[in-house]
Each structure stands twice: as C-alpha cells, then as structure tokens.
Curated annotation (Swiss-Prot):
Residues 547-740 form the GAIN-B domain. This is Latrophilin Cirl. Residues 261-271, 281-290, 1300-1314, 1444-1469, 1638-1659 have a biased composition (Low complexity). Residues 1477-1491, 1501-1514 have a biased composition (Acidic residues). Residues 162-290, 365-386, 1219-1247, 1300-1324, 1438-1526, 1551-1570, 1605-1677 are annotated as: Disordered. It comes from Drosophila melanogaster (Fruit fly). GO terms for molecular function: carbohydrate binding; G protein-coupled receptor activity; mechanoreceptor activity; transmembrane signaling receptor activity. Residues 1-753, 809-814, 883-906, 976-985 are extracellular. Residues 1660-1676 have a biased composition (Basic residues). Residues 775-787, 836-861, 928-954, 1007-1697 are cytoplasmic.
Length: 1697
C-alpha cells in the first residue's frame, strides 16, 4: 500500500489554517495543537519571553470536526475556536496530516499512519519540521514525554493524555485478570487499568503491585557511555520531522511494566530468508512500504513474569553517568533524580528493552514474536477451546520470546535539560535587571562557560542571555553620544559574545549538548547563531564609515565589513586565506548583490565561519554520534509493509553534515533575495563512503536544514561548489553509504587497488621492452613509416599508463591533478590518432607501389606527427579556453567532468579516429582479397602477406585497446555513483590492460624472428645471465632454411647413441638401418649449429655431427667418423635464412644475396669426409670433380700445386649458404612442406615466404675512386690445367699492374683535399631509385678462347656476376634485368647512405698472434708454401686439388723463393713493430705465443692473447679489442677446436704434408689494411686465418688479408672494384698533423703496410702509405645488407663526427 505524503501546516494566531488535498483524496489528521512549542514560529520580532509549553488538549478534536475525511477545510487559529491555554503568549495552530484516498476511509481497522521518522523512505530536508518540543514536566506530576518517536497506536501519554490527541480506534479486550484490565489499542501499546495509570518514579520502592526486583548479576554493561556499541543505539531517536528510524530497524512496542505509557523499544534484525507463510500478525500500517510489527497482548504480570531469574531481563542495571548514580530501573520506567551538585532541577533516564540479532539473518524467536495472535476472550474459549492455553504455558512462551532481548538505558546519556548551574541562573537574573552592566555580564558569561562544567539546561540559559544582551545594548547604545565610545563598547560586547559562543562549541562542552534532546539541541544552536548575528549587526550599524572588524577565537571567525559602494570593484570573498586556516571554505558575494543591498552608500556585511558546529546541527540521528549512528544503521533494518516481502529490502539513507558551517548576512540578517546568486566552495569533511551532496542552509524558523534557493554547481571527491540566491548559514549534506555493503573507493580499495597497480605495472614493463627493442635493434629493420607509427603508439600508451597511475593517487585540490587530466586527454587523443594513421598507412601501402618496397617515408611520417600531436594539442587548448574547470571538477584526476565539453572534445574525437581506423582496415581487407586473386610475382606476394599480417594484428590491437579504455571509463563512472557493476568493470579493466601489455610483447617482439634472434644473441653474449639461459636450446637460433628439394641443406650423420627424435621426412627404418642411415639426409637441427652460436657443451654420451666450412648448393654430408666429439660450426658459418643477421655480427650487418638461378657447383665428399666449396672470387671458379666424383685428399691437393702456385687466386673468405624452398607460382608459403621450417622475413612484424636465395655473409671495405670497373678473366681459376704454362707470368703481370695502381692512388690521395668535413660527409654513394624489374637481358660479349668450352649458361652467370654487386658503373639496363628471385639475370642492388653509426664496427684484422709452434718434421719452405696457400685463398685445409697430379714449374719455384724473401722482411718489420708495441704492454712480450709469433709471423705483436685448450679465458685470437669478452672466448674456443680436429685428421690419414703444390693463386699476397665492417672482423671462422692457422701459423710470416673480403676482392681482382667516392680522404692539414704527431702511427683499426713489398695488394689502395693514411675513425667502409624486401642494399659508412 502506497503511503501518502506526510505534511505539516501552520497558521499564526488570528490567521486561517487551510488544508487542501487533491481530488479523490481526503484529509487524515494525525495530530494537532493550538499553542506554542517553538519560539521561532510566528515570531517575526524575535520575542523570547513567550512560553514554549503552551498546548490546547482538544486541538485535534476541534480540527477533526472541521477537516476529517474532507478534501479541503479551513480553521481559524483563534482563542474563540480553541480557547487560550497560555495568556500573554502569541500562539499558532499546527496540524500534521495526510491526504489519503477516499477508498481507504471505509477500512476502520486501519490505524493512523505513523509519523515520517518511522515511515519515510528518505528523510525530508527539514530536519525537525514540526518544531515540536516536549514540555519539561517539572515536579512530581506526569513524567516528560518520551524522547522516542511517537509510534502507531499511541493513545496518549500517561498523566497528560492531551498532549497528542489521537482519533479513537477499534479496540479489543484481549485478556482479563482479577487485578487489572489491559486494553490494547491500535498500535499494540498497553494501557493499564486504574491502578496503574501513572508512571512510577520512585527509585527505592515500587507501587505497581510487583515485588521489589531481586539483586541481579549482569553480564553486560548498562553504562550509558558504553551503549554506543555496534549492536546498540548510542542515543535517543529524534522526534523531529526528518528524524528517521534507522534503516534495518524494526520498532516493536507493547512490552513494558504495567501502567507504562510509552512501551519499550525493541529492535530486531529482519531476515531476508524468512520462510514462506510466516506473515506478521502485527498491524499493517498504510504508508510507503513500511510496516511496524508489534508484540500483541503480552501482559507481563498476567504471564507470570513476576519473580525468579527471568525478571533480570526486565531491569536496567545500576550505573554512573554525569556525576550521578543511576539505580536499577525496570524496563519502560524513567529514572528521575535531582541534578548533580551545583545545578538545580531534575535529571531523567529511561530504561528500554532492545534486541540485536546478528547479520546472519532470521531468528526463530523473531517469528514467534511477530506471529503472536491475540488470546481469545473467555467467550471465545468456550466455543474454541483448542485455542485456549493455561497461564503457565503463556508465561513460558513469553519467557521464550523475550530471552534474546536485553534492557538498555536509552538514550546514551541522561536527560539533563532541566539542570541549570547556579552561576548561570545568577547571570540570568542580573541581565534582567534594569541598570545592569551588559559588558560585565558578558565578560562573566565568557569566563563561566570556559571554566565551569555546564549541563543541558545551561546551554539554553546561555543562548538566551546572549540574545537578551544584544537587545538591551541596542537600546543602550543611544545613551553614548560619542561615536568612538559607542563603537568601542559594542565591539567589546561583541568580543565577549563571540568568545562565549566559541566556548559552547568547544569539545569540552560536548557532554552538555548531549544532555539535551535533539529538538533542544537545534533550538539552542539556532539561538546561538541568531545571537551572534544580532550582536555583529549591532556593531555594523554603529560604524558610519568604511571599516572592517575581525573577531577570531578558537571556534569562531566573525568579520564585520562596512564597505562604500564606490570602492567595490569586484566580488567580496570571505574568509581571507590567512584568516581561517582551519578550513578551505570560501564564500563569494557578487558586486551587484552588494550594491542592491546598500544603504546610504554603505554596504554592511557580516561573515562568520564556525568550527565544530557541524557536530551539533545534524540533519538526522542527532542524538547519535557519527560512529554509533553508522553502526546502528548497519545492524538494523526497516520492514516492508507487505507480509510477503522480505524484510530489509528498503534501506534508509543516513544523511550527515559533511562540511563546516559558513555564514554571510546582509540587511540586519533578514532572509532577503539577491539579484545575483552567491558562490560557495565547501570542503568535504568525509571523503569516503559518502555520496549525493546537497547544498543547504539553516532555516531559523524550522530549526532544520533546507535546500530552497540553493543548487549544486559542481562537486568532486573533496569539494563542492554551491550557488544560493539568499544569505544565511550554509553547509553540505551528504548520504552515508554503508562501507560494509557498498565500497565507494577512495580510488581503488583493497584487492582492486593492488590488482590495478599490478596490471599497470605489467603493461608499462612490456611497453618499455617494445620501445627498447625498436631502439636497440633498429638495425634489424629498414627504417619505415610503420616503425615510426608503432614507436609513437607505444609512447602514447606509456604516457597514458603512467598518467593514469599518477592520477589515481592525486586529490582534486592539488594543482598536479589538473595537469594530469590535461596531459592524459592529449595522450589518449594522440594514441587514437596514431591508430587511425596506422590503418591509413596499411591502406596506402596496398594501393601504391609501396607494396614492393617499404622505405623511410619522412614526409609522410612528418605529416602524421603534425596531425596527431597537433590536432590533440589544439583540441585540449580549445577545451582549456572554453572551461578550464572541467579538468578539475571530476571526482578523479583521470577524467574530465561529464558535460557537453567532455563529449565534444574527448568522446567525439576518439570515436572519429576509431571509426576511421576501422574503415581503413575494412578497405584494406577488400584490396587484399582482390590482389590475392590476381597473378603477382613472388616479391609482391611476400609483401602482401606481410601487410596482411600487419592488418590482422593491428585490428586486434585496436579492439583490445578499446576494451581497456571503455572498461576503465565505466569503472570510474560506476565507482563515483556507487554502482554495483563498478567492480565488474574494474576487473575487466585489470584483465584487458594486462592482456594489452602481453599482446604488445608477443606481437611486436616475440612474433618477429629477427628480434627473437637478437634476443638470443643478447642472452648468449652476456655472462651475467644464468647459465641455463645461455646454454638452453631455446637460445640457439632455429632459423634453418634448407635449399630446394628434399635433401638440400641437410646434414647426414650416423648416431650411435639413443634414438633421437626423427625429423620430418625421415622414416624410422632409415634411422634404424645404419647403412640406410648413412645415405638418409637428416635436416640440420639446432644441435648442429649450437657450436657456432654458443659456448655450451652438449651431452657427451652422444656422437656429435660436425659441419665443416663449405659452400655448396646441395647436401652437406658428414660421414659417421665425425671428429672431436663436438658439434662445431665454425665462426661465421651458421646457416641462416633470407634476411637474417649474420651469426657473428650485430643487427643490421651485411648480407650479400645471389639469385637462385646462379647454381653453384656442389662439392663431392672426399676421403676426409669433409664437404666444402672453394670459390675464391664467387663467380669465376668452378671446382672440377675427379674421376670418382669427389674432391681429392689434402695430400693430392697439395701435391697439385704446381700450376696453382702462380694462380691469380685472391685471398677470400669461405661462407656457408642455404636456400629457401621454392614458394611456387603464387608465392604462398606452404608450411611444413618437406619438413623444412621456413623462417620469417619481411617487415617489422611480418612472417612471409621469400624466394629461393643463396645467402652470404661478407663484410667489405670500400675501394678507392677511379678503379676500373672491368673484371679480368682468370682462366687459371676456371681450368687449372690450362694455366700450367703461364700462371706465374700472368700473376707477375698482375702484380706489376697493381704496383702501378698503388703508386697512382698514392699520388691522387696526396693531391686531393676536401674543403671541410661537411663536404667529405656529402661524398657518399648515391641512391639508385630502381624501377620494376622488366626482365630485359643484356647482350653478352664473346667469351675468351680459353673459356669457350664452357656452357653458355655458366658463362652468362659468370659474366653477370662480374658486373653486379653494387657496381655503380652499370646503368639501369643492368639493374632492371630481373627481380632477386626471378630470372637468370643476377641480383639487383640499391645503394643508400647509412647514417646509423651503430651499424659500423671497426676491428683490426691484419695482426695475428700464433698460439703454438709446430715442431714436426716440416721444413720452413713447407710452411712458406702453407702460408702462401693461405694467402692465396685456398680452402680451409686440404680443400681439394685443382689438378690431377703433382706439377711443379719454374715460375712456381721462383714465386716460392720470393715468398721466403718477403717472409724474412716481414719478420724484420714485425720485430720493429713489436719493439714499439712492447712499450704498451710488457707482459704480452713475455708471452710464449707472442715469442713464437715474433719469429714466424709479421703480426706476432698483436696485443690480443689466445688461450689454449685448458684455459680459454686468455684466448682472444687477435680479436678486436672492441668486441665483448664473451664473443672473444667463444671464437677462441672454436679456433682451438678446429685446430685439434685438423691435426687429428692429418695424423689419421697419414698426410705427409707435402705442400709443394698449392691451389691456384697461392703466390705471395701483399698485405692490406684490415679494417673491416662486421663483428668478427678478420678472425671469422670463415676467414683465411681461421682455416689454416692451426698448423700453418708458425710459417705464416707474410701479411695475409685475414679479414672479410674487401669490396674489390668481392667484386673483382686487381683494379676491378666499383667506382666509389673518395670518402676516405682527409684534408691536407689533417694529414700533415697526423704525420707530425705519429710518424709511425698504427691504430687498432689499420694494418701495417710494408715499404719493401714488391707486390702490393689491391687493398693497399685504401691506405697507400703507413704514415699517410688517416686514423681509423676517418675510414669509410662499404657494406651490403639484405633488407626486408629481399633486396641487397649497399651501405657506405658515414664519416665520424
């Protein structure tokens, strides 16, 4: 049943009271009174002499006769109608009524609706709207009215039945006893017979017929101060209009002593799980879903509750409170006794019965009580004897029902309203005298209130004296003719009054306020405020010129300002920042409002700020302290009016005053309207578990807070801004939310806060890793627009995460809070913009030529930067200009206030960017679908697959980021509004944000094979990482790409250990059969390359597969008799797939790629079981096979050196290679085909298939400008038998030509001089912008006669290779021959300038040390031959013979003789250099290896030490000093292992080591500068030095190239390098300085050139003279790198800055 609105009407004496209801409703009066209960109602002049205990008993009857059950009525409030209950007092008529439906009037059993403090679901804003007060009840008459709210069914108050007149109700006689008759009225309240019509107030003895109470032993404390527990109320319930019954409270009445008038307060916790059918039998009261259940018809006397231990539950135990001893008191009685010493009057305290049930819910006895039915009368028992029970059974049942109730003193403290101190009574008498000194009285009053203990009555007296003093001073001031004296007197009086008011508000007087009932507290507070205001305006009216007076005491700041209107230029603000440090509240009065209220050109304003007044002017539960009220609300509940509705569903709001009270008044304090509203900023006292702020003012008439005329402008967690159109005392009301049921987070509480911190931390870590990856491994990628876009996205996301983390810890008052919100706004807009541009970039890539080649597009990226950050900053700037406060008005520092500006500048731009990103993604998918159906070349399909993968991942990234931001937004909004779904959104945010960080790491780091390899390399190269990480197989590169066919690029071996895991394509039978296993290809696994990539040892129980150096197109064959027991791939020889970094170089190192049509000649397996390929110049030499199809043994090889001695072979480096499987016509990658894993290549995060490639890993030195581009033909290299007769002569001719070229280059270098380093930096290779490869062919010249026997295909490949390799002398016709993986046209290169200094690493590779001296029976000439063979670029060891027998010629002998001479000269130079170098390091001079090298090799003085087999830590093998220690140790270990295996192979096969015959080109090679580009430098395992140094090093005295190939070595021989700019030149002044400073300068980056070398090497073109070449940092080197588009890029090293 819907409860009608409870209303109150007033009419002053002589006026007409009109009550009117809506059509269809009638008036239902609840109570009425004609008289006066409030001093403020109908008191325009502030008269305080009127009586406030004035009442007419028949007021309700008179009003009922005129208005009951009518739609409207009017009653004149006059004594002629009601009589004159208090002559001399101006009276008013007060009526409390409801408008109910006319249909309800036919039900006569309905009881009147209870007052609003029981029925209202929400408290009215007027705290005590009725203004009703209870009479003091002095004397031995009737006791005072109860301080409990009047409950339904109240007939009257004993001894004063006319206080509230209730309409008669239907009653029923429920039980009769001989001693008394008890009538139960509508509410279940007991009305005793004639023998018990008065309330006992005799503490010593009882006169109600009950025996005296026994001595009790209480197990609980009944002390008043201790009752404010979580399970007990701490104070009394209010009787005011807005005093609401606590939520979760059930008021039960009807249990009490015989003759009591107001029953007992029984509260229980309702159960939400009440069994069905347990309907309450108590009366159902119409009204707003509330029900009051009553215990019907329980007569404790009749029930036999008159003795024994059970009676202990019906008495409150004795206790001490307020300096009084309170004896045992029966439940329902009021203990009355005189006031404490020094005070006059009486003190009272009531004993009530109260029950608490735990939160577990339903209690069985609660159902027993609520379901009790009235006992049938005697007549009914005759007709229905089954319902009659004997008295003993009734007593037992009552005892059971009441056993969980306990008696409690209520309220928490006694009522001392009538207690007045003697000294304040004296002051009251003095102030009423005619000639009293007001200043003296005011001083005495301030002294008494600060030093004496006050009681409740003293508060009333003090505020009355304050008002009386102000009224008398108003009349007395006219007696002072002097203006100064008048102002001084009033100012002194004001100071005393302010001090007195501060004393009353002091914490020491809190008990005095608690002595008053809630109504008296409000009345005293109102009187105090008006008294202060009257005295302040008394001073303001006295001042006749502009002046400001400030009175500041402990708890009150009062300011009186008199301003001239002509001086008011702006709004007036109170208080000043330095006046009131207790609070940050402020009030601002607009200038127009002040001018409108001026008088005589002056504006008089009174401001006041109060401390601790908020604890007095409580809107509800004023008799509770805050802690107790929260506890009380949390543990109690209000029941629903319907019996089938679970109890506790309707929860009452608890409102508190959540700010200090601040006041402003104009016009002598009158309630005037202002032309412009004032602005108030009030700080919240409580920021947690509060919500719904309301701006209110204190209504003097109603003694309550009201919101009329005030509105809330904005609010956040700590402050609220209000606007009011009038002046008075202002504050903020807020609802308290039960923190046990609802968690309104400070930001995030408990686990939620911890989880959010963890989530943000994880995301930030992964974003930082992604950013560092892009920065540190930037050489992995070709710098592109996509890389820049994702870098910007990561930066924005990082800023968002960090700002969010900082913002949740800030308060809205801090300046930092606004900045966080501003920057977060900008970061979110920028991040969404970058996502949009990323989608647009993918779309533009698909619709333009960018699909084929993605390079750095600086103009486009700059445009992206401008649009993203420019637009974001512009939008934020516009938002700041429009309304800066929108960034500081929200509850949290991470959100803007949700207003129109928020949606216009934040929501709409974000949605636009997201929609645009999704739109471009959709268009990109459409284009990709179309392109996939068309015939594209392999490269286009590769790029298309890359873009497809990018779009997929980006779309998922966008969706995940949207989920993160949406969940965060809804969580913050829900937390602010205390929404139950806030936790759900919070945990969604935690999950999504964590997934976002993981996705960034996996998608942009782990998913990319290039980055994975760099991670593994980083792990292996840092010794501080755990051994398990550096030795795990997961740290070894798995990017093995086999060649075309099922057996290409595989390794065959026999394993005698346990059966390994069979690779794909290998049958189990083949594995079990040793012979078949010999021929079964085994794909190269990670185990096979572990030795080349880490220093980890494998399980010694298994045989290891050994892969030696070699270069071949077919299968790498390793016989069963593998050596060494270790799997070792030589340094620099790890198989890599297309586009991957070389094993011993950093990211972005050089790669050279050949077209797959250039079929290299596969080498057969020789007797040594080694497979390798010897290709000195990479294009012109083909190893002929023997009759058996295999290479000759090392013995045969060295015996066949007759013609090879003068062969023009160039020193070279042997490289491994591999091929990717053919991707087919459509370029689509077939995963798992043939069991060959395909490694990814491509763009930043793509995984695509590339065309079949042959991959090399050289590093190059730049050549000098002016070198011819021709490539000489070496017939000796192609067919050694043809070169038998002229090899030596031809070689001598070549050496002579090189010496001439060297001389020319020296002259040119001395003459050239650049004007500045800037010009020098500009001399770089030009970028060749290549068009699409059209496949055009260039006519080949006729081959030389000695090569006519070879096939056309071989000659075509040989010729084109000589004209490729970044040859700048060629035109576009050559470069447009075909794509990389296309026709037989050779590779296509692009040459660009590398500005990344991180890609360039210079090492000294010309100087070597010798680790041990070989003392076998080998002559010096043999070692010379070995050294010459090494210098000539022979295979690693016994690489095969080029001829069929042992041939020796005169030219060869002469060449060997020259080698011996050069060796002796080199030894002398080495000794001289050692002398100079020994000054730097004397310890190394004594080293055994250095001593041996000093005798046998010209680079013996290299400062790098090499550790032996037992001690690897000192073995650096001449490694570059710049390399890290881990790589030095790794390479040293591999060199040692190679040496051991080589020696074992020689001893095993019994090789006599006859080095009389050497491979072609084994003549002496001149030294060259070894500064190279790459990590491994000249000591790479694929280098010359690594091949033969184990045995031949002792005889290696001549300079050997030792390093990776120079450009002219790779591209041609002699003067056949590509023409490059003179980037290696320095100005003449610098060269002269260098010559002066270092006449014998040798740097770590340059080799030493022999003056006496008759056959200078072409590499000397780089540094023609040892004293003239510039320092190492001035050298510039050329390198080639395979980009993500499978195109070789030649990089020219930038000059050092």
């Amino acid at each position: 049943m819907i409860l009608s609105k409870y209303q109150t009407a007033y009419a002053c004496e002589g006026k007409k009271l009109t009550i009117e209801c809506d059509p269809g409703d009638v008036i239902n009066l609840i109570r009425a009174n004609y008289g006066r209960f409030s001093i403020t109602i109908c008191n325009d002049h502030g008269n305080v002499e009127w009586s406030v205990n004035c009442m007419f008993p028949k007021s309700l009857s008179v009003l009922n006769s005129r208005c009951a059950h009518k739609q409207s009525c009017g009653v004149l409030a006059a004594t002629s109608m009601f009589g004159d209950p208090c002559p001399g007092t101006h009276k008013y008529l007060e009526a409390h009524y409801q408008c109910i439906s006319a249909a309800q009037t036919s039900t006569t059993t309905n009881r009147p609706s209870p007052p609003p403090w029981v029925l209202s679901n929400g408290p009215p804003i007027f705290g005590n709207g009725s203004g009703l007060i209870h009479p003091p009840g002095v004397g031995a008459g009737a006791p005072p009215p109860p301080r409990l709210p009047t409950l339904p069914g109240v007939v009257g108050i004993s001894g004063n039945p006319g206080l509230f007149n209730v309409p008669p109700q239907h009653t029923a006689v429920t039980h009769s006893t001989p001693s008394s008759s008890t009538t139960a009225v509508g509410g279940g309240r007991l009305k005793g017979g004639a023998t018990s019509t008065t309330t006992t107030k005799h503490p010593a003895g009882r006169h109600d017929g009950l025996p005296p109470p026994p001595q009790l032993h209480h197990h609980h404390n009944h002390h008043g101060e201790d009752t404010a527990s979580p399970t007990k109320p701490s104070s009394k319930l209010p009787a005011g209009g807005n005093a609401t019954s606590p939520s979760n409270t059930r008021i039960l009445t009807g249990v009490g002593g015989s003759g009591t008038d107001d029953g007992t307060l029984l509260t229980t916790k309702s159960s939400p799980n009440r069994p069905p059918g347990t309907a309450a039998s108590g009366s159902v009261v119409p009204g707003n879903g509330s029900v009051v259940r009553t215990i019907n018809n329980i007569n404790l006397n009749a029930a036999g509750m008159s003795g024994g231990d059970d009676e202990s539950k019906l008495f409150c135990g004795p206790t001490h409170a307020r300096n009084l001893y309170w004896n045992m008191t029966r439940v329902g009685d009021v203990n009355v006794q005189p006031c404490p010493g020094g005070a006059a009057g009486i003190a009272k305290w009531r004993c009530v019965l109260m029950k608490r049930i735990p939160d577990s819910g339903y209690d069985e006895y609660d159902d027993d009580i609520s379901s009790t039915t009235p006992a049938p009368s005697g007549g009914d028992c005759l007709h229905n004897s089954s319902s009659c029970e004997p008295p003993v059974s009734m007593a037992h049942k009552v005892n059971q029902r009441l056993r969980n109730f306990e008696p409690t003193w209520h309220p928490a403290t006694p009522d001392l309203t009538q207690c007045r101190s003697l000294w304040l009574n004296n002051l009251e008498m003095r102030v009423n005298q005619r000639d009293s000194s007001l200043i003296s009285i005011a001083n005495d009053m301030s002294e008494v209130t600060s030093s004496k203990t006050l009681y409740g009555g003293d508060m009333l007296v003090t505020t009355k004296i304050i008002q009386t003093v102000s009224e008398k001073m108003m009349h007395d001031k006219e007696t002072f003719p002097d203006q100064r004296q008048r102002e001084a007197m009033i100012m002194e009086l004001l100071h005393c009054v302010v001090k007195t008011g501060s004393n009353l508000l002091d914490e020491s007087q809190l008990s005095s306020w608690l002595d008053l009932n809630p109504e008296d507290q409000m009345r005293v507070a109102t009187s105090l405020l008006t008294g202060l205001e009257y005295n302040a305006f008394l001073l303001a009216d006295t001042i006749i010129r502009e002046r400001s007076v400030v009175q500041k005491v402990k708890n009150i700041l009062l300011s009186v300002r008199v301003l001239e209107t002509k001086t008011i230029q702006s709004s007036v603000v109170f208080p000043d920042s330095d006046q009131w440090p207790l609070s940050s509240d402020r009030i601002e009065l607009p200038r127009a409002a002040l001018i409108d209220n001026s008088e005589g050109g002056l504006v008089r304003i009174v401001f006041a700020a109060f401390d601790r007044l908020e604890s007095i002017l409580k809107p509800s539960y004023d008799h509770f302290d805050l802690k107790s009220s929260r506890s009380y609300v949390r543990n109690t509940a209000i029941l629903s009016n319907d019996s089938d509705v679970n109890a506790g569903e309707i929860q009452q709001r608890l409102r508190i005053l959540n700010s200090k009270v601040i006041s402003a008044s104009l016009g002598k304090g009158r309630h005037i309207q202002l032309s412009q509203p004032i602005t108030l900023t009030l700080k919240h006292l409580k920021t947690e578990n509060v919500t719904n702020p309301t701006c209110v003012f204190w209504n003097y008439i109603d003694h309550a807070w009201s919101a009329n005329g005030c509105s809330l402008e904005s609010t956040n967690r700590t402050h609220s801004v209000c606007s009011c159109n009038h002046l008075t005392n202002f504050a903020i009301l807020m609802d308290v939310v039960d923190e046990h049921q609802h968690s309104l987070f400070t930001m995030f509480d408990g686990n939620m806060r911890i989880f959010i911190y963890i989530s943000i931390g994880i995301c930030v870590v992964f974003i930082v890793i992604a950013l560092l990856t892009l920065k540190l491994f930037n050489g992995v990628f070709v710098k592109s627009a996509r890389t820049s876009i994702y870098t910007s996205i990561y930066l924005c996301l990082l800023a968002i995460e960090l700002l969010f983390l900082l913002g949740i810890e800030q308060t809205e008052t801090s300046i930092f809070c606004g900045f966080i919100t501003i920057f977060l706004h900008c970061a979110i807009l920028s991040g969404t913009a970058w996502f949009c541009y990323e989608a647009f970039h993918s779309y533009s890539t698909l619709t333009s030529d960018e699909l084929l080649l993605e390079v750095d597009q600086t103009p486009k990226v700059n445009c992206y930067y401008l649009l993203s950050y420019g637009l974001s900053l512009s939008v934020v700037a516009i938002s700041l200009v429009i309304d800066p406060s929108t960034y500081t008005q929200n509850d949290y520092c991470v959100l803007m206030e949700a207003n129109a500006l928020f949606y216009a500048t934040f929501v709409i731009p974000v949605l636009v960017f997201f929609v645009a990103a999704i739109g471009y993604t959709f268009l990109s998918w459409i284009i990709m679908c179309r392109k996939s159906r068309t015939g594209l070349k392999t490269k286009e399909h590769t790029r298309l697959a890359s873009v497809r993968f990018d779009i997929r991942c980006s779309f998922v990234f966008l969706l995940l980021l949207s989920a993160v931001w949406c969940s965060a937004y809804f969580y913050l909004r829900g937390a602010k509004m205390d929404d139950d779904t806030a936790d759900v959104y919070g945990y969604c945010f935690i999950c999504f944000n964590t997934l976002l960080g993981l996705y960034i790491f996996v998608f942009h780091c782990i998913q990319n094979e290039k980055i994975r390899r760099e991670y593994r390399k980083y792990v292996r190269q840092h010794a501080w990482l755990p051994k398990c990480l550096r030795c795990s197989k997961t740290s070894i590169s798995s990017g093995i790409v086999t060649g075309n066919g099922p057996t290409a690029g595989t390794l065959c071996s026999v394993s005698t250990s346990k059966k390994p895991k069979l690779p794909l394509g290998v049958s189990e039978e083949a594995h079990d059969d040793p012979q078949q296993q010999q021929q079964t290809p085994v794909p190269i696994t990670e185990d096979a390359i572990m030795g080349a990539t880490s220093d980890c040892e494998l399980n010694e129980a298994q045989q290891r597969r050994t892969l030696k150096s070699g270069l071949m197109t077919g299968t790498l064959q390793a016989p069963p008799q593998t050596l060494g027991g270790h799997v070792v791939l030589e340094r620099g020889s790890t198989l890599r797939s297309t586009g991957h970094a070389s094993p011993t170089s950093s990211a972005g190192s050089t790669h050279l790629i050949f077209a797959h049509k250039q079929q290299q000649q596969q080498q057969q397996q020789g007797p040594l079981g080694e497979s390798y390929y010897h290709q000195p110049d990479y294009y012109s030499w083909k190893q002929p096979s023997t009759g058996t199809g295999g290479l000759k043994t090392p013995r045969e090889y060295y015996n066949n050196a007759g013609a090879a001695a003068s062969s023009p072979q160039q020193a070279h480096e042997v490289f491994y290679w591999t091929q990717k499987p053919n991707s087919g016509h459509n370029g689509k990658k077939k995963r798992g085909a043939g069991g060959v894993p395909a490694s990814p290549s491509g763009s930043l995060h793509s995984r695509t298939a590339a065309a079949s490639q042959v991959l090399f890993y050289p590093s190059y030195k730049k050549t000098k400008p002016g070198q011819p581009t021709g490539y000489p033909q070496y017939a000796e290299a192609l067919d050694p038998p043809l070169a038998t007769g002229n090899a030596a002569a031809y070689y001598q001719q070549q050496q002579q030509l090189r010496r001439q070229q060297l001389h020319q280059q020296q002259q040119q270098q001395q003459q050239q001089q650049l004007s500045s380093d800037e010009e020098q930096a500009e001399q770089h290779a030009h970028l060749l912008h290549l068009q699409r490869r059209a496949g055009s062919q260039q006519q080949l010249p006729a081959p030389p006669p000695h090569m006519a026997q070879y096939q056309q295909e071989f000659m075509q490949r040989q010729y084109r290779n000589k004209h490729s390799n970044c040859d700048l002398g060629m035109g576009d016709a050559y470069y447009n021959q075909g794509s990389v993986g296309g026709a037989d046209g050779g590779p296509v290169y692009e040459e660009i300038l590398s500005n990344r200094n991180s890609d360039v690493q210079h090492y000294e590779v010309g100087d070597f040390d010798v680790d041990e001296v070989y003392n076998n029976s080998v002559g010096t000439g043999v070692f010379n031959n070995m050294r010459a063979a090494v210098a000539a670029g022979g295979s690693r060891y016994g690489g095969g013979s080029l001829s069929g027998g042992s041939v020796s010629s005169r030219s060869q002998q002469q060449q060997l003789k020259k080698q011996q001479q050069q060796q002796s000269l080199a030894q002398q130079r080495s000794a001289r250099r050692c002398t100079a170098d020994d000054d730097d390091d004397e310890d190394e001079e004594e080293d055994e290896e250095a001593t041996a090298a000093e005798q046998l090799h010209d680079s013996v003085c290299d400062e790098d030490e090499e550790e032996d087999e037992s001690d690897l830590e000192d073995d650096a093998h001449g490694l570059p000093p710049q390399s890290d220690e881990r790589m030095r140790r790794l390479m040293a270990m591999q060199d040692e292992d190679f040496k051991r295996r080589f020696q074992r192979q020689l001893r095993k096969h019994g090789a006599p080591l006859d080095y009389g015959a050497l491979p072609p080109g084994a003549g002496p090679q001149p030294e060259h500068n070894g500064a190279v580009f790459g990590v491994s430098g000249g000591v790479g395992e694929g280098s010359l030095r690594g091949a033969f140094r184990q045995q031949q090093q002792q005889a290696l005295n001549a300079k050997s190239p030792g390093g990776r190939l120079a450009v002219n070595e790779l591209f041609g021989h002699g003067n056949s390098g590509p023409p490059l700019p003179p980037a290696n030149q320095t100005p003449a002044q610098k060269r002269q300085q260098l010559q002066k400073l270092s006449p014998q300068s040798t740097t770590s980056s340059s080799s030493h050139t022999s003056h006496s070398n008759p056959n200078p090497h072409p590499h000397q073109l780089t540094h023609p003279h040892p004293h003239q070449h510039p320092p190492h940092h001035q050298q510039r080197h050329l390198s080639a790198m395979l980009d993500e588009n499978n195109t070789v890029r030649c990089y020219l090293e930038p000059l050092a800055k």
